[in-house]
A protein has these predicted regions:
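Compositionally biased terminal segments of proteins
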Residues: 1-183
Length: 183
């Protein structure tokens, strides 16, 4: 697997193969995509992502098909994973957006507000922790949503997560982005 990660083309080909596998089993599947995959597919804000974070149904069938596709395409073993499920908000706002759809595979994603809240909750700034860190994605989403100040951003995060669970590093990061003129 190249160090550049999963490009839009690689992801879409893998999703087509996943849909084809579901057709053969006469099963309809759904992936709710998160993180870098949404930034690549829906917003073209990145050229690649290290993996596809998603929650999916039917989980066992999709997991098995994804493992086979990964082996055939020389993708990382966890190219499609549900590690994000521990970060899902009780206010789970998802849309189809402009994501491509496949015959037996429906794709959804969080609203931009929800995705921004998730990115702020993670607030990964070290590229070793996340392919590019979350900072670029946070900047992109704040601009996309036309939010004018850090307080507006943090109010939005609090719509999705209890205020006492919002990491202080998220508040400092967002404040610094505005103070440094990056927004």
């Amino acid at each position: 697997m190249p160090r550049t990660g999963l490009s839009k083309d690689v992801i879409l080909k893998a999703f087509q193969e996943l849909s084809d596998a579901l057709v053969k089993q006469n099963v309809k599947g759904e992936l709710c995509l998160f993180g870098g995959t949404v930034m690549v597919l829906a917003y073209s804000a990145r050229v690649s992502t290290k993996d596809v974070d998603a929650i999916f149904q039917p989980a066992a069938i999709i997991r098995d098909a994804a493992a086979q596709i990964g082996n055939e395409r020389d993708l990382p073993p966890d190219w499609l994973n549900d590690g994000v499920k521990g970060f899902i908000s009780a206010k789970h706002d998802v849309v189809q957006g402009n994501l491509p759809q496949f015959p037996n595979l429906r794709l959804t994603m969080p609203t931009p507000e929800y995705l921004l809240a998730m990115k702020c909750m993670a607030s990964r700034i070290n590229p070793a922790e996340s392919q590019e860190g979350d900072v670029r994605d946070i900047i992109f989403l704040i601009r996309h949503l036309k939010l004018g100040n850090a307080a507006d951003v943090m109010r939005m995060v609090a719509e999705y997560y209890p205020p006492d669970r919002i990491p202080i590093k998220a508040q400092y990061l967002v404040q610094a982005l505005f103070e440094e003129g990056k927004i």
